Structures are given as C-alpha cells and as structure tokens.
Amino acid sequence: MVLPILPLIDDLASWGTKKAYASLVGQVLLDGSSLNKDEVLQFAKEEEVPLVALSLPNAKFSDDDIIAFLNNGVSSLFIASQDAKIVDHLVEELNVPKNRIVVEGNGVFHNQFLVNQKFSQDRIVSIKKLTKDLLIKEVVAEVRTDRPDGLFTTLVVDQYERCLGLVYSSKESIAKAIDLGRGVYYSRSRNEIWVKGETSGNGQKLLQISTDCDSDALKFIVEQENVGFCHLETMSCFGEFKHGLVGLESLLKQRLQDAPKESYTRRLFNDPALLDAKIKEEAEELTEAKGKQEISWEAADLFYFALAKLVTNNVSLKDVENNLNMKHLKITRRKGDAKPKFVAQAKAEEEAPTGPIHLHVVNASDKEGIKKALSRPIQKTSEIMHLVNPIIENVRDRGDSALLEYTEKFDGVKLSTPVLNAPFPEEYFEGLTEEMKDALDLSIENVRKFHAAQLPKETLEVETQPGVLCSRFPRPIEKVGLYIPGGTAILPSTALMLGVPAQVAQCKEIVFASPPRKSDGKVSPEVVYVAEKVGARMIVLAGGAQAVAAMAYGTETIPKVDKVLGPGNQFVTAAKMYVQNDTQALCSIDMPAGPSEVLVIADEDADADFVASDLLSQAEHGIDSQVILVGIKLSEKKIQEIQDAVHDQAMQLPRVDIVRKCIAHSTIILCDGYEEALEMSNKYAPEHLILQIANANDYVKLVDNAGSVFVGAYTPESCGDYSSGTNHTLPTYGYARQYSGANTATFQKFITAQNITPEGLENIGRAVMCVAKKEGLDGHRNAVKIRMSKLGLIPKDFQ
C-alpha cells in the first residue's frame, strides 16, 4: 500500500526542490489545469515515481493527448465531479479501462487502480505546501501497532523488491529516516535509533516508504550500499540471493570496472560490433531452439549479452522494468507483427533455400583466414555450470525422487522407477529386426577383437638393479557408468563402443544410462539388445546432467560407479567435469567433449565424390559440427568438382537443412605440400582425420594429434563409427593433444609393484637414504637404514 497522502504538482520547479523527500510517498498527482502536455509527458517519462496520476480538466487535452499520457507513464486519470460526463467518452470511445479512471464524489476520489482505494480532498496536498514535518506527521499518523514497546514491524526490500531483512521502527526513527533520506530503524538490542551503515559502512538510500493493507507494518524500499544488509556480510538476512538477472547485472557492472584487458568480457565492452553480433547470433539460436531445456539455455545466453549491452550503455534493469511497466499500461497496442525486414527474413527461411551448398576457400598463407577456419565455437563453461550445479546437487541429495522429477520435466515422461534391471523384459526388444541383430553382432564382434588384442598378455616385469624387481599389472575399474544419448535419437553404436571394452576389461558392474522415449517411456530395443550382450546390470532411464549425477553419487536404486563415460551435449559434459572434481563423488571420466568434427586431407588424385561424402557424414551431426578440408595442390577444377559433389549429395540427404548451415561455416584450406597439410592437422588436433591422398599409409607416421585416423580412399569415417573395430568415442575440441579415444585401458587402472631382496636393498639403499636426507624426511631414511643395519650392510654407527 502507498501512503494516504497525494502530492499535487502544479509546477515542475516546486517538485525539483522537494523531490528528495516528496518522492518517498511513491505517488503524485499532476495538476492538468496548470501543466501543459509536454510538461506532463516529461514528468511521466523521466521521473522515477511508481504511480503518476493526472487530474484531467474537461476539454483542455485532446483525445490523442490523453492516450499519449496513459501510454507513457500516467497510471490513472482523476476526474472532478463537474467533469464526470467525460467518463463515458473515455471508456467507450478511447477504450480507457474503468479502473484507471478516478471520479470525485462528495469530496472523495474513489479509485481502484492506485493501491489506496480513495483519497479525500484534504489528503491531496500541494507540493508547495508539503514539508518534511507534514510528511512525517502523515506517516506516523497512518501506521499503528499493538506491540507493548510501540515499535512498528518494518520490512526492508531493495529496488527490485527483494527482501533484505525484517527490522523495527519507532516514530523517532521514521522521522529521522525521512529527514535524512536514509535507512534508519530502531535497534531493540541496543535500545536506540539505528542509522544503517553508520558504523559498518553498509548504508542505505531510502527510496520509498509504504504501509501494508492494515497499516500495521511498514515497507522501506532502499538502495543497498556496499557488501549487503546483513551483519554476516550477505545481501539479505535470509542468505545470498540466487543468481538471476539482477545478480548477472551486478556481476557485469563489476567486470566493467575490473575485467582484465584481454578477457572476453572486456572485449565485449570495448567492441560494440562484436557485442551486437553476439546478440544477433544468440537471438537466432533462440528462434531455432526446441524443447524446454534448450530454449531456456539459449534464452539465458541472449539475456547475458543483452545485459552486457545495457551495462555498457549505463542502462539498468530497473530502466527496462520501468519500460515494461509503461508498456503494460498502454491503451492502444500495435498488432505485434515483426518489422518488415524480419517478416521477410522469416518467410525466406520457410522457403527451401536454393543457393549452392559450398565450403569457403582460404589459402594457407592467409593467417587470419586460417585462424578463423580452425577456431572452434566458444564454450560458455561457467554459464553452463550455473545451470547444471543445482541439478547435480539435487540428485545427489534427494536421489531417485529428484531423478524422476527431472525425467518428467526434461524428457516429458512420468516413470514409477528410474531403472530397468537385467534380465530385460521381452517387451523391450519389440521392433528389433534380424537384420539389425546381425549388424550389431558383427560390430560387437569386431570391436571385441580389436579391444581384446589390447589386453596385456602378461605382467610387465623389469629388474632395474640386481635384486630390484619392478612390475606393472592391470585391474579392471570395478563399476562403470556408460552414458548413451537418446530421446529422439537411436544410438546403439555408442552403447557397443562403450559396453564391449568394459566387458573385455572385465569390469564387474556395467550400468547404462539413456533418456527414455517420450512416446512410451522406453529406450530403443537396439540399446537394450547391446546392454544384454555386454552384460549390463541395468539401464538408468534418464539423460542429461541428472543421469551423470545419479551414477556418480548413486541413489536408492542406482549403484555408485567409479567412472562415467560417454558422449553427450554440453550439459552432460559439464556434469562429468563437475563430478570428476568432487571428492564426495570419487568418480573419474573418460574425457571432455565438444561438437563432433572431421578434417579431411585430400590431393589432386582424390575422388571428389568420396571427399564430399566424408565431409557430409560429419556435417549432418549438427550445425555446430566442424568440417574442414585441407587440399594439397588442388586445381581450380578439382575444387569445383568437390564443391559440386558436396552440393549434389547434400541435396539428397534428409538432414539437408542442418548440413547447409554446417557447410556455411566450413572451409577448404589450400596447402602446397603433404608435410604442411599434416602440420596444420596436428595443430588443429581433429577428432577424425581422413587421409585421401596417394600413399596415405606412408604419412600416418607424421600424425601427432588426432582421435582416430582413416587411411586411404576406401576408409570412410562411417566404418570406424560402427563396425571396423576401433572405438568411436574420441576426444574433440582439440583434446586429442592430451587424450586418447576410448580403449580397453580406459576401463582399467594399472597397479605397480616392487619386490626387493637384500641384494637389491644393498644396491639402491644408500641412494634412497641420500635423497631422503636432502628432503628432510628422516622417517623415509630410517626405514632403509634399519633394514640395512640388521643385514650388516652398513655400520651400526652409520649416520
């Protein structure tokens, strides 16, 4: 509720001299008989007063003027009794809502739009007569209390209506708060008036005072200064606020002041063109987003860059909120159609594009062009973590109930249990054809052969000195969780690429996780078939970060695993990164992941159709896939053949729209030699490297960084993805510099052992004691010294 006093402004100069305390009321009445149209609009637009009313004299303002007032910040119209006849005109002709019209009756203005439902004439006070003392008197007279100490309960909120704390006020503290324009309260512990921030420095600028509906509690709206309201140095006495738009605005304001010169945020602040481009990019991604999680994610991205533009231009969220409030009050509204250029663009997108699907061409000597071609999309890790962390923590703390809630929320399926235990019911194999079984069996067997060959044949033993035998032997990781992307996609290949090596390594417990289908709550029969073949204990019917958390921490029905493996979207990757760094989880992962990618090296003799097919097999994964062709001494004719083949084949693919967008940011890099091409590939470190060059096998020795290499014209990436035997779970985003693809050793750990005889101790003991002494670790030294002394290998008085 606002206070039952309404300052009447008949000239703007008087407002300017008394604004500091008059604005605390939170409402004003503009005198339409004294102010002209421009003055009314100027005040309504520029002054930050929550409620602006206008006394409307008959016939002074035109209909257009009245609509302009109501559409630009004037909340309601006060009509004197003698002018009441214009009310019908306002409602019926101008479409003004009745609750925005206040009509006088017997000296009282009855109103349903402002919070107070009526104002008597004596409560409407000319701004020229309004003093601090009068305002204090009105406030104190309005509020009441039944407390024995006479104090008034006071809720303190910030300008965004977020609660900072609950305090108490006395008549004297209210008077002082209005006098100083600061947050002033009554301290019950000290039994005295409390000027907030007087000792702590965490003061408050008082913006508005109001009462509740019964006038037995006050609300102070303040602008909090420095670290916060609470003595514990949090913004609120109820803890820190959640990260939201207000928190992001605060963070960006801070970064505007102290962001490092080379940071990405500083680049955004200093480069308006880059910032505008990111806003357009994120807006486009939001229009293309599907599903609740993706739409909310893309919207958050757009909000980030939009807020960066606001902060850069000294525009606050409060300014935006005021604008929204003003728009909410509009009487006449435009139809809401998009601007013509965007309508035209939308129509153009609805029509099938007819332009050629071609890659960009850049020469290796063009350093900037190469840098752009080899750059990968920026991954907003910290922003993703803000979304993922609460999901992980909720599943960790609440187990199955949280997991089921997220499955219903994100996958649209309400399940009674989050797991499908082995042996798997026959109904889950329905729809699985014999042809598919044969294809999966062949793939499983080939992957098994290749990964079984990787098992060490015997324990590694090395005698480093006579009597010193060192050994290393593998042991399987006991429990592994294998994430299989699913939902609308069917990816049995990922299931077998992870499940078979786990079985070969003899992991004791294999757990699959895959999001259920929205249609029936099941996973695809192909995935269930692979799970049965590799001896999986169960399939967790969940996806995303929640599935990773369930396996990493365990729930009532899901065992805690020791390692989580498998590809996924950015949320899955973020969850894997989180759990591997949490000592409470004690869970490792296979590798980080990014968008899928391929780099093809081709020379003049390469088959253009083969090259195009390899590029397109990667491009159809998604618009963010990375597709690069490095050409060695390619002629203009060969380049055109490849471009034509890309276009012709792409137009035959069901996912041509995705391919078109991917190829639009893909590149052909022209090199002069094989070594230069391999050097460029090593720098990029692709997930998939395809060598369509003469004598391809001779150049494999030059490959330093790649997830997997496909050698020769008849080795498409597709074979490695499904059936050749190598693993398709590979490092992306340049991580091939540090990580291997999934292999048998991925599912093992290696333990070392040493067996030292007295002869061996004699050979290395003095060296051990020497180094231990230098490091100041006498216990280490003594463990050797005691043994050697008892063996008579050193004198008893040896120091």
UniProtKB/Swiss-Prot annotation:
One of its GO terms (molecular function) is phosphoribosyl-ATP diphosphatase activity. The lineage of its organism: Eukaryota, Fungi, Dikarya, Ascomycota, Saccharomycotina. Keywords: Amino-acid biosynthesis, ATP-binding, Histidine biosynthesis, Hydrolase, Metal-binding, Multifunctional enzyme, NAD, Nucleotide-binding, Oxidoreductase, Zinc. PROSITE patterns: HISOL_DEHYDROGENASE (PS00611). In the C-terminal section; belongs to the histidinol dehydrogenase family. Residues 230-312 are annotated as: Phosphoribosyl-ATP pyrophosphohydrolase. Residues 313-799 are annotated as: Histidinol dehydrogenase. It comes from the Eukaryota. Its EC number is 3.5.4.19, 3.6.1.31, 1.1.1.23. HAMAP family: HisD. Residues 1-229 are annotated as: Phosphoribosyl-AMP cyclohydrolase. CDD domains: Histidinol_dh (cd06572), NTP-PPase_His4 (cd11546). Pathway: Amino-acid biosynthesis; L-histidine biosynthesis; L-histidine from 5-phospho-alpha-D-ribose 1-diphosphate: step 2/9; Amino-acid biosynthesis; L-histidine biosynthesis; L-histidine from 5-phospho-alpha-D-ribose 1-diphosphate: step 3/9; Amino-acid biosynthesis; L-histidine biosynthesis; L-histidine from 5-phospho-alpha-D-ribose 1-diphosphate: step 9/9. It comes from Saccharomyces bayanus (Yeast). Zn(2+) binds at Q618, H621, D721, H780. This is Histidine biosynthesis trifunctional protein. It holds the Pfam family Histidinol_dh. The active site is at E687, H688.
